[in-house]
């Protein structure tokens, strides 16, 4: 029997009309129950804290840029192999492999640079111009990338038939040119030297994803969100191969993140370790009941530190059967045996053929590029987030580089024109550039200062970007009124 997914309806399901004004907003009371939104707006905290991937990275988890290479390595472990085998047993004839995806991405970009070349070249050039903290090796790598890519662009531009040349061709030969260039670049082969240089750069970016230069190559190479977007469309087209691939990618991502949280929980949770680092971001948020936390991370660390934390993109503790409209929950992912879950529990819940169809997927936010694909659960979270941002007098952003293309969330922050905004990040230049683009400010109009021993820049008399390491930074000055 062909799998035809019913993706509409249900408490935590995908709703096609979710953006309509008549959509009902439901509040979550913290006990797993939903209720109608109260008539009066609930009180809001003075300070709002927004957590990004940099906060989890500070306690040992991979950054978003490191995610796919880390998953590839983990799938080579005994645990990873067992989970991969269990999933493939359920998802028959699955062809997707993370390691092959990485190799194909490198080969594809090395052979055909037209799609990404100009974007990478522009971003690297901007990094070279504005980042005064690059060391000599980073500047040389950046210069090499720009020079190599520019030479390709120059050759292509030089071969173009401009208007003057086109007119001369008509006058001399009486013919109208039918091509735009004098070279067929589809048949042009790069030399082995060039291919080896590009492959070296791409391979280097896999293992040095935080490099200020190489990250511009890397983010155009491997992007877990783009990967999920690519296969999420299968739920709309009814294509089983795409559905199976999405199930595999999302469950492997979930399993790897649970594995990482289990390994690092002792560093974060004082209930299991008395010597936990209370100076970590999560340690410093504990007991701050007057502060609202919004996290973009999937781990439970935010909820451990602040039970009222809002999970903007989803959480590891929830998953959903999108076919039968059932919300499912993990009581304790720290004691969860991943192998047992994938060999015993998930096979009972997942069914793609026969009379019973059931499609459980991790409760990750459906990719934002699919703007009409949102659920009632997320509308609730986003509404509460929007209200918290709107009423906050101080917004503290930690480890999250807000970018202009994140329009949905960026608009929430931009619309509060009175709040004091503090962003703390290791990369001052990039953080300033991204935040200024988001808030429509000039990145060069700032006052340079030192706050609590850290370099900082102040914009618009209310926005401060601080360069600091979140694993050691004392947040007390910003967490107190």
PLM segments and residue spans:
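Long, low-complexity intrinsically disordered regions enriched in small/polar
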Residues: 1-39
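Generic recognition of cysteine residues
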Residues: 3-5, 121, 260, 432, ...
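A broadly conserved detector of short glycine/acidic/proline-rich loop/turn motifs that flank catalytic sites
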Residues: 11, 18, 316, 401-402, ...
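Intrinsically disordered, low-complexity regions enriched in polar/acidic and amide residues
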Residues: 12, 22, 137, 368-370, ...
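Short hydrophobic-aromatic micro-motifs
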Residues: 15, 310-312, 397
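SIR2/sirtuin-family catalytic core signature
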Residues: 34-104, 112, 377-481
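Extended, H/D-rich, highly charged conserved domains that either
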Residues: 88-368, 373
